[in-house]
């Protein structure tokens, strides 16, 4: 009986997605690279992704392109769905995040390559008037994107991130059902079922451990209890953790 219920549930998912694709609806948010999309189907709701690489190889830049800029462009072409990104910037400030967006837009729109320092005319570099005019033309993009992307740069511990995400979802949905006696948890029901929620943490090696925890324990707890159990399985979020892959540094940090 249980086996039949499992199969029937799986079959329902398969048939629902097949019908949705045949009707031209979205089942995953595709990347702008055709070859990559053949190997990786894009972002799916209720999944946990980890973007990992060694120090200073562009993890944050790749994350912003694939999970912020590409998602923004994809959904612009699919107005039947909506999205919200809760981007927890543990390393950079909110200002630095949006400056990096302007830098990316300048390259995409005008093939102009500028660092954040150059955007702010630091050091020996002074921004020219023509580039400043082009920066001003990015305003509509940034204004529109910032209405969908919340950059949180003041929350550093796992529970704080969990609470922020949980509170946002309660403002945009409700919890129903549940039974203490039967040990059944409440189910989350979004107000808008066509809204895709993203939780991005960049990067989890910078999480602040709770009192008595090591960094290794804090990362494990965050991934297992908050990301997998709550964000993914309960809230159905697209959850992305950026992880620094520097084994020597990690071992030193984990054992402090």
Positions of predicted regions on the chain:
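Flexible beta-alpha connector loops of hexameric P-loop NTPases
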Residues: 150, 209-220, 252-256
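Cytosolic-facing regulatory segments adjacent to core modules
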Residues: 38, 73-193
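Residues immediately C-terminal
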Residues: 206
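Loop/turn-to-beta-strand initiation segments
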Residues: 146-149, 195-198, 234-240
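Substrate-engagement module of ASCE P-loop NTPases
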Residues: 72, 218-245
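Short regulatory helix/loop adjacent to the ATP-binding pocket of P-loop NTPases
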Residues: 100-102, 248-256
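The Walker A/P-loop phosphate-binding site
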Residues: 2-110
